[in-house]
Amino acid sequence: MQKENKLPVDDMWQWKGGAKFSNTVAVGDQVFISGQQTLDKDGVVLNPGDIAAQTRNVFENMKSSLVGLNMGLDDLVRLNTYYVFEGDDKDATTFWEDMTRVRLEYFPDPGPAATAVRAKGMPYEGQLIQIEGVALRGESRRCRQRIMPEGSWDWSIAVPLSQGWKIGNRIFVGGQISADKTGRPVHVGDLDAQTRNIYEYIGRVLSDAGASFSDLTRVKICFKYDSKDPNSGQAFVDRIMEVSKEYIKGTPPVVTAFAVDLLYPGLDLELDAMAIVDQDTKALAPNELGGRYQPSEFSDGVLADGEIYIGGQTATEPDGSVMFPGDFSAQANEVFQRLDRVLQEADATLKDIVKLNLFIVGQDAQVEEFFHQACRVWTEVSPNSYPAMTPVRVHELPKPGLLFQADCIAIK
């Protein structure tokens, strides 16, 4: 399918060092929007430490990107926000509410399905927020259906965001948390109950859209960092994936998991999801791909209605040990090679990627260089390939020693 890649031009924000990725990629009725940064044309951070100013910067950048395609923020069906807050958990909700009051200046009504999580950081010191999204155009945009199930949770302040959107046979499920209609966490201290509660919310979105768990193509697991069961010692992320297996009903979805902090104190996880209703959905399972952190019940990739979703790839041996410990570039190369091998199962290549997500683990002084290393490795592995891209610094990945993870969406 023909793609329209828009690279930054003129005075648009840019990464340092000439790293090139598309600001937007339009394909068919969808527009994939890169993580929008609070940077200038030389990659210098604007308004460092000022969350209100930075929030306006990234929304203005997203708005400008859409205007260039004769679109607007009201065309968004998905919006992901990664933000940084290093204060006490008890102050995190107030910080989010203050940030969101600025976001409310830009949210359309009805708004997109949205996920917002507290990341460890961004590629450059002083960055506090980035946003990415998916927008719809044409007949699909006109015929979209908002999904707001009865009995779902709600936010602690009034926002016009949506629990989900149905566009044809696609269902965008926004971030789900274990909360009630006032935004108050429920099942605090019970990871299994929180996880099942969230899947119940996801199930309601799917049901109201005429779909079911058998139509899931991707699940994103944002888990509380540095968390283990105090009795068994099992990592929260491993237990979340075990419970998630209860909801596999058809072709297994792909999974990407990474550690964050959560919106409200007492929450252990947030999940969002993508579903596509297609009776010919196919799991992609390359031979000898290597090890992974996801249970074998999940797919490496899923092909549904011409769209390819690849779960989080890491440099993991078949025995679960980490490859190339301490060597970020080697891990990044392995990860990108694995993306390519999964794509080959669908007769696709890295050049078919429309959205690439990078998850980086590193110390404060390392992260900027790690990000630029990932960009250089990408250019070596897939020259002249410019997908939309979002890089996030996360607290940790599912296995200690992993420094890098990537997942992607591709359309042939």
List the predicted regions and their residue ranges.
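N-terminal presequence-like segments and the immediate start of the first folded domain
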Residues: 1-60, 64-77, 83-217, 223-337, ...
